[in-house]
């Protein structure tokens, strides 16, 4: 069994289906009562690394935010990163990129959204938009010109996997942007060089650590670059198969206390 090569000093956790069971809207007790308190006691930094913006964090996570829990955040796929209330780094789309996306998506009849560090603004309301955003944010703004009022770090586009090839052929992405699927009817649209990995590298430098001191837990496609970057990666038992293949270790399912199991297995806790 592969083991971490260096002492683990910081651990990055994805939110959905890693820390948080989205379908049942809860965080396992093993995380709230054992994992986070014990990491803090040992001086290991627990950090969030998520595709969500801070304004879209689930309510169940809120009690774990603060000096006794999470104070370090890699959000919006590494594009807005902060410690306590201090920003470490921010990346985003240019106005030209946003307006090209709007033009292409309008021509394709696809609804879209703008994501800022705190808000999500959708171009229109429809059943697909409501279903996709329901687990992350219900109090979104409806405003197709929102990007002119507030800096949009990334966009969302609401279309099924069956349209993936059509989107690739449309010229929407070119060689500047990428689409990362997080829902059967929704993708993140971001600059091709941006990912959780970029945010993690910024955070590691900020704290004067080495990447070998970093561990990460995840389950989805937006965790692939993160797994390639950190010193040791752990895929949840419920993770996408491609991520499991990329991981250094595959632990148990989220509802089988997979995070606690792995940390005990490697004697980190």
Where are these regions (language model features)?
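Mg2+-dependent phosphoryl-transfer enzymes with acidic/Ser/Thr/Gly-rich catalytic loops
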Residues: 2, 6-10, 188-269
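Asp-based phosphoryl-transfer active-site loop
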Residues: 7-25
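Active-site phosphate-binding/coordination module
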Residues: 30-128
């Amino acid at each position: 069994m592969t083991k971490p090569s260096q002492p683990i000093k910081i651990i990055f956790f994805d939110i959905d289906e890693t820390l948080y069971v989205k379908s049942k809207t809860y965080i396992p007790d093993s995380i709230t009562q054992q994992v986070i308190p014990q990491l803090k006691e040992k001086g290991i930094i627990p950090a969030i690394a998520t595709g969500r913006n801070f304004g879209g964090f689930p309510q169940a996570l809120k009690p774990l935010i603060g000096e006794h829990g999470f104070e370090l955040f890699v959000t919006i796929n590494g594009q807005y990163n902060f410690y306590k209330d201090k920003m470490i780094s921010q990346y985003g789309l240019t106005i030209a990129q946003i307006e090209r996306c709007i033009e292409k998506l309008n021509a394709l009849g696809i609804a879209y959204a703008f994501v800022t560090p705190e808000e999500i603004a959708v171009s229109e309301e429809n059943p697909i938009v409501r279903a996709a955003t329901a687990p992350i944010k219900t109090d979104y703004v409806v405003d197709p010109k929102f990007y002119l009022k507030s800096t949009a770090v990334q966009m969302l586009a609401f279309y099924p996997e069956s349209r993936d090839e059509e989107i690739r052929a449309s010229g929407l992405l070119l060689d500047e942007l990428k689409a990362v699927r997080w829902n059967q009817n929704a993708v993140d649209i971001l600059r091709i060089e941006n990912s959780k990995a970029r945010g993690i590298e910024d955070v590691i430098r900020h704290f004067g650590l080495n990447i070998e001191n970093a561990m990460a837990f995840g389950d989805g496609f937006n965790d692939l670059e993160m797994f390639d970057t950190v010193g040791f990666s752990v895929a949840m038992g419920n993770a996408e198969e491609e991520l499991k293949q990329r991981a250094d270790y595959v632990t148990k399912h989220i509802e089988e206390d997979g995070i606690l199991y792995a940390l005990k297995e490697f004697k980190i806790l």
